[in-house]
Regions:
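C-terminal beta-strand-rich structural cap/linker in extracellular carbohydrate-active enzymes
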Residues: 999-1021
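Polysaccharide-binding surfaces and accessory modules of carbohydrate-active proteins
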Residues: 187-191, 331-367, 385-438, 442-559, ...
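Glycan-recognition surfaces
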Residues: 718-747, 751-755, 759, 804-909
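Extracytoplasmic
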Residues: 47-334, 980
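Conserved structural scaffold segments of CAZyme catalytic domains across common CAZy folds
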Residues: 415-417, 434-440, 450, 454-456, ...
Length: 1021
């Protein structure tokens, strides 16, 4: 087995997308060295070069007025690469930045920022304007390190001088050649002639890279007999002078040829690109048509097709026709409550359901739902205040979008209300049926519970004829100005949740006032829409994870959301790591994910309640007899030895723990000594012998495996455990055309439903059990959730396959091991006792901050959907300082936790740190509570908050962090942090030193660089 190399992820070129990206970051490295230089010796001037079009500007990365920090440097660019000025800014890694100074524009507004860059592998950067909030972007790789690529995003600039900063966020960023800026909103009123045709080969179009005009086979029937092909490796085709008489929404029909499924990114007027996966045509001589909607401004427009560094279809022509209107009509959202007089009602415990002349109301103790049967729209209110208005449902069936509002009949029958009792409690199920001639029935289903602050909403599409299929079912959609209004405007945020914990993904608490590049901010499975100041807010998310990957798209302004779509069928290269579309769910009846919607006085309570709602559907994995149910304590090999693991090192570690840490670093006598990847450096006999030594020392042995990945390239290699019946070429996951899916993280995905895959798992895991291992870390599980063509014909989606594969693992292990999911989706969650809350942590201060970002917004998983949240190991010797090493211990202790060290015990400095930092009884007791601390603040963007709190019976614990290498003073409002009276006296005990102090109202904490503090807090009456 080989561990992945993080910097060289090996993604397939042809499937790199620049649109529909969930925000993810590498990691944040605090405490830069402070080195700051100005680019010197550049041939270009710092001033902008005004382009031919008004409102366009170009700035060179090597301009003398720019500022470089950290390792950033100006270097030469190969002549063949074609860098403007012959130079680039490179070395953007490990805490470096490039700032373009004096970006001067005449007009304030939204500008399209085009970055000309070079990146031989996929890399990211953070962009901030005028010192404002930093946004993260994931750039696709260019063909190689000698090929330029282009990436577009939108920024808001003020009139006059501006600064634009590119930050590597502690990771690795591309080399930057230059940036171009173009005013985006320079159009006026006006629609094109219906059905206007624009040829790809037209003389005024602009082709870049490999793109070229070529002949088209006569049988294909291309208009004009020609097409534009070779859209690969960083090429573009731009249609110029797309004329519109008035601004509005238009249907764009793309006539194309593609013998295999290929994506293409499309941008209008140099705006944000959106990626579309065009289905394959019958062959490379057959035309296909793909239709979508775009917004055009009055006058001349441009439409650009970009291969994103991969492979895109050949383009014959475009046809543009008016779609009608200037945007989607939200419907009569302000008249939803006009439903006439009440006709009849029934009570079900504390829930009252009332039928009205033109609608119905469903009312619980906490909330009410009003459904208008004339408009097909719903409104949700809590405590008498409407927070959501204009809610409806949609489903994409092949090329037909079903919209519940557009059905001719919306019916509700009181007699059809069902009493229910399930894991959520007692309640009712209410169904609204939408019917139209010639369309399948769409059912909107609400489940209300007597004792829950949330309700559940889902949808079904039911066909009386042929089966229907969809990979986009949205039971909750809002498209109305101010459609979601939580009623406050202190510091309104939307939480963006990553699908898994791979590639150093981060959560983001983004300002609700985000209306640009929103495809970058799709949240996976759940979100919170809240005011950080008052903490009130909505929590919305899926509670069923048997079929769908759920996405949440949103857009907002003026402290409200104008768009919200919660849908099953979400895939993204950077979030779910899928390289093809979500699988289609087919049947006479197809059902969406079930979505919980709740409002809370404290969004943190809401997130925990959301976790409980999921556990009500799929409880966390139980501890079977013989598996200790307490916090796992011990050691893992990866941080210490990586690929150099050996039998002698395992024995040395086991002996060291017995001789030095047995009495202090343990959970009631249980200590795990775990071998990570490269355990197969040991022979079978050495593995058996190592387990014997570990057990003799009074410890338990742990092991590692990646059940859904293949690290090799030999598709003829026999699969172990199958007696030669299957090769890896048989069990790797493929697309519908039979093509092997590209590597992700350097590994091929294995089909969890294939019998060869399952036999492999049985063969390896039964050996582990036979050797005597009692703990297993299973890694790269996200590969098992990829969309593809699975062996089991009943499996239509990646999540269905994942459920099957994980259930098979549980069955094979038979409850005899502690199961820790490492790189894994957050959901489904019922197959592991613990899950890593973040990606790999190497012990440095920057990685600790990154890990605590995941705790800041993901703590609620602890004790709800997982018994424990795993902060990854503590490699103390890599902290860089004693303070940073101690901070790593504090971070692990408050995280929920799997309490594992990962130091090289032959290193004298590591030994000292282990003996000093792993033996504090009071600190270890906090870790053994097994509860994750809550964040005090939730307004940190992609960073971690610096104050966390845990209430333990009558007492509290408080953790305070300094993520920089400079001294810092933290002032903590005790009422906000602990909820205590402003006049209450509080006794603080420093957990590490035992020092006591008494304070009230606020606490001032003086921290050295990289230092953190843990306090026990007693509130005196």
């Amino acid at each position: 087995m080989r561990r992945k190399h993080w910097a060289l992820s090996g993604k397939g070129l042809f499937l790199l997308l620049t649109a529909v990206l969930l925000v993810q970051t590498a990691f944040f490295t605090p405490g830069q060295s402070g080195r700051e230089i100005h680019a010197a010796g550049a041939d270009t001037e710092a001033a902008a070069v005004v382009q031919a079009a008004a409102g366009s500007y170009s700035y060179e990365a090597e301009a003398a007025g720019n500022t470089l920090t950290g390792k950033a440097e100006i270097k030469a660019c190969k002549e063949a690469t074609g860098c403007s000025g012959g130079q680039v800014a490179g070395g953007l890694w490990g805490g470096s930045s490039l700032t373009f100074n004096d970006i001067t524009v005449e007009t304030a507004g939204v500008y399209t920022l085009t970055v000309h860059y070079i990146s031989g592998d996929p890399r990211s950067f953070g962009v901030s304007v005028n010192g404002g909030t930093k946004d993260h972007y994931d750039l696709p790789k260019t063909a190689d390190w000698d090929t330029l690529g282009v990436y577009e995003l939108e920024v808001e600039l003020k009139a006059g001088a501006n600064t634009i900063r590119f930050d590597d966020e502690g990771g690795y960023s591309p080399d930057i050649d230059r940036i171009d800026l173009r005013l985006s909103d320079n159009g006026g009123p006006g629609g094109p002639v219906t059905g206007t045709v624009y040829e790809a080969e037209a003389a005024n179009n602009v082709l870049t890279g490999n793109a070229a005009v070529s002949g088209c086979a006569a049988a294909t029937g291309c208009s004009g007999g020609r097409k534009v092909g070779n859209l690969w490796g960083g090429s573009t085709l731009q249609f110029r002078d797309i004329m519109a008489e008035k601004a509005g929404v238009y249907k764009l029909s793309i006539y194309y040829i593609s013998g295999d499924p290929r994506p293409v990114s499309i941008s209008v007027n140099d705006g944000a690109s959106e990626n579309y996966a065009l289905p394959k045509t019958e062959n490379w001589d057959t035309l296909g048509v793909f239709t979508l909607e775009i917004e055009l401004k009055a006058g001349a427009n441009t439409i650009t097709f970009n291969d994103d560094g991969g492979w895109s279809p050949d383009i014959d022509k475009l046809e543009i026709a008016a779609a009608g209107g200037g945007g989607e009509d939200p419907g009569p959202v302000d008249n939803i409550g006009v439903i006439g007089k009440a006709l009849d009602s029934d009570k079900y415990g504390s829930i009252k359901v009332t039928k009205h002349e033109k609608g119905a109301t469903f009312v619980s103790r906490s909330y009410s739902i009003t459904f208008n049967t004339e408009s097909g729209l719903a409104a949700y209110a809590w405590n008498g205040k409407t927070l959501v208005k204009g809610a409806y449902a949609s489903a994409q069936l092949e090329d037909k979008l079903l919209d519940s509002r557009q059905y001719t009949e919306h019916s509700f029958k009181l007699k059809d209300v069902e009493k229910i009792k399930d894991g959520h409690g007692k309640g009712v199920r209410i169904t609204v049926e939408n019917r139209s001639e010639g369309l399948p029935v769409m059912k909107q289903i609400y489940q209300l519970y007597e004792d829950q602050p949330y309700f559940l909403v889902s949808q079904q599409v039911v066909s009386s004829g042929a089966a229907v299929s969809s990979n986009d079912m949205a039971p909750l959609v809002v498209n109305a100005s101010g459609g979601v209004d939580i009623g406050t405007g202190g510091d309104n945020r939307v939480l963006i949740t990553p699908f898994d914990n791979d590639m150093w993904s981060r959560y983001q608490a983004r300002t609700i006032n985000t209306a640009l590049n929103n495809n970058n901010y799709i949240s996976s499975e759940m979100t919170a829409i809240y005011d950080n100041t008052s903490r009130t807010g909505l929590v919305i998310g899926s509670v069923t994870h048997d079929v769908w990957k759920t996405g949440i798209y949103w857009s907002g302004s003026n402290d409200k959301l104008n768009k919200l779509k919660v849908y099953g069928g979400f895939t993204s290269l950077t979030s779910t790591h899928d390289t093809i579309d979500h699988g289609k769910v087919s049947g006479q009846t197809i059902t969406s994910p079930q979505i919980a919607v709740g409002y809370y006085n404290d969004y943190r309570d809401g997130l925990e309640n959301y976790g409980e709602a999921n556990a009500a559907v799929a409880p966390p994995l139980k501890f079977q007899k013989g598996v200790p149910s307490g916090v796992p304590v011990g050691w893992n090999s990866w941080g210490a030895y990586e690929s150099s693991l050996s039998y002698d090192k395992v024995v040395e570690v086991s002996n060291f723990f017995k001789e030095n840490l047995k009495k202090s670093f343990t959970n009631d006598g249980t200590v795990y000594i775990n071998m990570d990847s490269y355990w197969d450096n040991l022979s079978e006999q050495q593995l058996r012998d190592a387990v014997k030594v570990i057990r003799k020392n009074g410890q338990k042995a742990g092991i590692y495996y990646g059940p859904f990945v293949y690290w090799g390239d030999n598709m003829s290699q026999p699969v172990e455990g199958t007696n030669g019946k299957y090769t890896y070429g048989d069990i790797v996951l493929r697309d519908a055309a039979g093509n092997i899916l590209p590597k992700v993280d350097g590994a091929y995905a294995i089909d969890p439903t294939h019998p060869g895959s399952q036999q492999r798992v049985e063969y390896v895991f039964k050996k582990f059990l036979d050797y005597g291992f009692e703990y297993i870390k299973i890694d790269f599980l996200t590969h098992g959730s990829f969309e593809g063509k699975h062996y089991d014909p009943k499996v239509q989606t990646g999540i269905q396959a994942y459920n099957q594969g994980m259930a098979h693992i549980n069955k094979t292990l038979g409850g005899k091991m502690f199961i820790s999911a490492s790189i894994a989706p957050m959901f489904p969650s019922q197959y592991a006792h613990a899950r890593r809350i973040s990606c790999d942590i190497d012990g440095t201060l920057g990685r600790t901050e990154y890990q605590l970002n995941n705790l800041t917004y993901g703590w609620w998983q602890n004790g709800t959907i997982y018994a424990y949240t795993d902060p990854d190991y503590m490699t103390l010797a890599k902290g860089g300082s004693y303070n940073a090493a101690q901070t790593r211990v504090n971070a692990a202790a408050i995280s929920g936790t799997v309490y594992m060290n990962s130091d090289d015990v032959s290193n004298v400095e590591a030994q000292k740190l282990m003996k000093s930092l792993l033996t504090n009884k009071s600190v270890n007791e906090i870790a053994l509570i097994g509860e994750a601390f809550r964040p005090v603040e939730g307004n940190t963007g992609t960073a971690a908050t610096d104050v966390f709190v845990l209430q333990d019976k009558k007492d509290y614990y408080l953790a305070v962090f300094n993520y920089t290498n400079e001294a810092a003073v933290k002032t903590i409002d005790l009422k906000r942090a602990l909820g205590v009276s402003a006049t209450a006296k509080v006794e603080l005990t420093d957990v590490w030193t035992g020092t006591k102090a008494e304070v009230k109202d606020s606490l001032q904490v003086n921290l050295e660089g990289a230092q953190s503090k843990l306090y026990k807090v007693k509130v005196k009456k």
